[in-house]
Amino acid sequence: MCSFVRVGSPKPLQTSASPLEMSSLRRTRAPEISELGLTPEQKDDIRDRVLRGSKSPTELGFDLRLEQDRKWRERMGSSEAKSPPCHALGVGLERHTISGTPTEMGNLGLHKGSAFQGSKPLGVLPGRVGPENKGLPPRLRYGGTLHPPFSTVHASPLAAESRRRPLAWGSAWTDAVVEKQPVVGLELRKEPEKEPTCVVMNPYPEMPPKEVDIGLPQTQESDEAKNTEPLIGLVREPSECPFAQQPEEKKEPGSTEPGVEPPGNIRPIYSGKFFDRVPCWPSAGKVKPVGYRVATCLTEKLPRLMTPPEAKKYFNFRYPPAGAERVFYGRANDPQIAPYLTHGLRSKISIPMGSLINPQPITTFQQKIKDKKESIYFSHQRAPLGKSHDQTPGLPKGMDVINTTLGTPTIRELSVRDTVNPSKSFEDVLKEGQEGHDLYTVSHNDYFAGEAKNRKYNPASFHRFNLYGIPTPHFNDGRTMAKALHWLHELQMERGAKIVSKRVDDFKEKFQHKLGKVLDPIAETMNVPPGHTFGSCLHPEEYGAGDLIHYRSPDEYLRGKDHQRAVVAAARHHLKKFNHQNFDTLQVAFRHYDKKGDGVIDRAELHEACVQANLHLDKMLLDHLFDYCDVDQDGLINYLEFANFLNWKDRIPLKEHEKRVVVKGKKPDCENVTDTSMGEAEPSLLINPEDIVPKEPGSSEETLRTIQRPGDKVSHQYKTTSSEINAVVGAVPSMCHPIFGVPTIRSDISAPRIRRVSDMNNYGDEGNAYSLLHPSIFSQKGVFERDFFKTRSKEEISDILTNIGVKLSKEEFENVWNLASKKHQRGEVCVETIRNVLDELLHADLVKCKTAM
C-alpha cells in the first residue's frame, strides 16, 4: 500500500540538507553501514571513506551496487540491450535494506524541508544533468551525492511521527514494491507522450512549503502556472539513526529590509554559473557576501533621521545655519532676554524701506487721480517720463500732426559711405589719382611719397639716378642710434669736469647727515680745536653714591680705585686656584703659608707664598692685598681671614680633626721682657668653636662662618627719598588719589547676569594666581564662590549644616539665622554669612573661656 503526498508548484532549484550527520561535538560521525551484501574489506573501505568526508555511506553503497550491476551486465554480454537508467537505479535499489513498517509503507515523509524542493518530472533529479550522468544520482552543491530516497528532505507531520516509531522493513515487502514500482521517486519515460506519470497522493491537508532564498533570480509565475494542479512524486522514507542530531532550523532575520538580502547570506561562488565537477575539493577564490548592494547604499531612507535637541546645540555651535548667529552650546538653552531688552529711546517707525523700493500697486482710479495732480507741473507737460511731450497746444488748430512735415527737406546726393569707400576697383581709383598729377607738381609741389623732385638739370651732364658724395657711415650695433638719442650738450657734460654750485655744496655740508658722525649745523662757525669743550668742567667728588650708602670713611672711598681693586681681585683669584689645586684641606693650605707655625700669616710669609705660587707682586700691590685680607687690622692674617679671602671654603670641606688643632703661643721677645710676660703664652685652638657654622640650615656638614669687611655693611641711619615722600602725619591717603586707566578688576561696573563668550573682563568673581596654585578644599570639591554667596532659604541652610556635621539646636539655629539676616539690608542669607556668624560666635566663646581662666 502506498500513501501520497502533495507537492507545491514548481519552484527554482533550492538548497537541500547535507546527507552527513553531525555528532554533539560538531564532528562528522560515521553512520551505521546498512547490510548491502558487502565483504568485510568493502565495509572497512566504506567506513574509512566516510570518516575522511568524501562520501556518505548511502552514496558509497549506492555506487557499489551500481558497480555490481555494471559487472553483471558485462557478464551477460549484451552491450546493446542495456537497461535504462531508471531500471538500473531500480535494480540497485532492490537490495537496499529499507526501514519501515508495512502499515506505513506509503508514509514517505523524510527530514525537515519541502518534499522535493521544487517539483521535477520523475526521472529528472536536481543536480547535474547530462548524458554522462545518466543512471547516476545527482551531486549536491556542497559535496556529496543526492539520493532521492535518502537525502530528500520532508516537512510533513507524518514524517515526524514516523521518526518516533520503531520501524522495521522487510525484504519481502521491498521486492513487492520493486516489482510494482521499477524506480522509487523517478519517472520512466520511454515515450513521453504515451507513458503516464507515477505520482503519490497525500491524504493529509496541504501545507505550503517554506521557501528558502538561495540568491538566484526568481522568475515571475503566470496565473496559469499558479492555477495548475501541483505535480506529485513517489518518495520513500530512509533509515534514520535514533541518535543522529537533527539539523538546526535557520531563523530568518527579523530586521531585514524588503528586497534586500542580509549580509550573512553567502552563496556558493559557482551557483547558477558552472557545474561543480569535484564537489569534495574546496572552491578557489573569495566568497563575497551578497547582502547590501550599491543601489541600496545610494538609496536615501525616508523619513530622514532627526538630530535630537540635546545634540543639536553642539552641531549649531560648530556649523551654524546660513544667516543664523553662532550660539555657544553652554547658553543655547538659556532664556532669551537680550532680544527683548530696549536700550535708549524707542524711535517711531517711519515708512519702511521695502514699501519705498517696491511699493504696492495702485488701482486705475488712483492712477488717474495721481496723473491729474501731476498734470499741472511744467516738467510733466514738457518732459513726461518715457515719452516726448505733447506739442499739440503750440500748433495751429486743425493741423494733421502725423502726416505734416515741418522744415526744409534735405537733398541727399552722395552718402558718406560712398565718399569714404567708393564702389570702384583699385585700378580705377589709381587711374583717377594719376590724372592731372603733372599739373599739381608744378602748381602745388604735390609729389607722391618717395617721388624725387625734378629740378630740370641738364641730362647730358647730370643724371638724376646717379649717386654723388661720400657714403654715409653705418654700424649694425646701433651706436649711431644711441648717439642720436642724446642731446649734444649732455654728451659734452659727461666729458667735462663736474661743476657744482658753491651754494649747493655748502648746503649739503651743513644739513646732510654724514655716516658715523653727529650732525653739527654750526661747525663752520666754530674756530676752535677739535677737542675743545664748552662750559666749565665739573670735578668729580672723592666719594660716590655707594660710599654714601655704605657709610665708608674717607680712606675707604672706592671712587678712583677701580684699577687697584681689579688687580687685588685677580691676585686673590690666582691664590684661590693655587690652593684648591694643590691642597686637599684648608689646614694643609694654611700650614703652607704659615712658615713659622704660630697660627697667623704676616707680610713676609704672604710674599714668600706668592712667589712660590708664581705670583710676583710689587710692594704696593702686596700691601693692598694684605690690607684687604686683614679685616681686624691687627697686621696679621688668621685662619678665619685666610679661609674667607684666599680660599674657596665651600669647595674644601672642613674635616673633623681640624676643629681640634691646637696652636702654641709664640715665645716672647727677649728685648722687651717685662714682669707680666715672663712665662710662655698659653696654647689656643686654631679655629674657635663660634666660627664653625653649618654649611646649610639643617645640614650635618660644617664650614667656617663668612666675615664681612666694614665697608660692606650698610648703615641703618640713611633713608631713601621714596620713603620720605608723603611721610607726613595727616596727609591725604593714597586711596584718595585719582585713578587713571581701566582697572584690572572691573569693580566699577556690575557684572552681567549672562556673560558673553567674548567678554574677557574680570568682575571680581574669578580666582587669582594664588587660588590656582593653592586651591582650597572647596575648589577641590567643586564648590565655588557663587555657591557661597547664593541666597538660600532657612530649610536649605539647615540641611547644609546638617550634612556637613554642624549640629545646632532649634534655638541656636534661630539665633544664628537672626544674626545673619541682620547683616543684609533685605534680610537675605547665604552660606558665607552663616560661616561668618558661626566664626564670630566661636571667637566670642574662646574669649570668654580665656577670661574665666
UniProtKB/Swiss-Prot annotation:
Ca(2+) 2 binds at residues 630, 632, 634, 641. GO terms for cellular component: axonemal A tubule inner sheath; axonemal microtubule; sperm flagellum. PANTHER family: EF-HAND DOMAIN C-TERMINAL CONTAINING PROTEIN, EF-HAND DOMAIN-CONTAINING FAMILY MEMBER B. The gene is Efhb. Residues 581-616, 617-652 form the EF-hand domain. Keywords: Calcium, Cell projection, Cilium, Cytoplasm, Cytoskeleton, Flagellum, Metal-binding, Repeat. GO terms for biological process: flagellated sperm motility; negative regulation of protein binding; regulation of calcineurin-NFAT signaling cascade; regulation of store-operated calcium entry. InterPro entries: EF-hand-dom_pair, EF_Hand_1_Ca_BS, EF_hand_dom, EFHC1/EFHC2/EFHB. This is EF-hand domain-containing family member B. SUPFAM superfamilies: EF-hand. Residues 1-31, 244-266 are annotated as: Disordered. Ca(2+) 1 binds at residues 594, 598, 605. It is found in: Cytoplasm, Cytoskeleton, Cilium axoneme; Cytoplasm, Cytoskeleton, Flagellum axoneme; Cytoplasm. The keyword Metal-binding applies. Microtubule inner protein component of sperm flagellar doublet microtubules. Interacts with STIM1 and ORAI1; the interactions take place upon Ca(2+)-store depletion and dissociate through a Ca(2+)-dependent mechanism. Interaction with STIM1 inhibits STIM1 interaction with SARAF. Microtubule inner protein (MIP) part of the dynein-decorated doublet microtubules (DMTs) in cilia axoneme, which is required for motile cilia beating. Cytosolic sensor for calcium, modulates the interaction of STIM1 and ORAI1 upon store depletion and the activation of store-operated Ca(2+) entry (SOCE) and NFAT translocation from cytosol to nucleus. The keyword Cytoplasm applies. One of its GO terms (molecular function) is calcium ion sensor activity. PROSITE patterns: EF_HAND_1, EF_HAND_2.
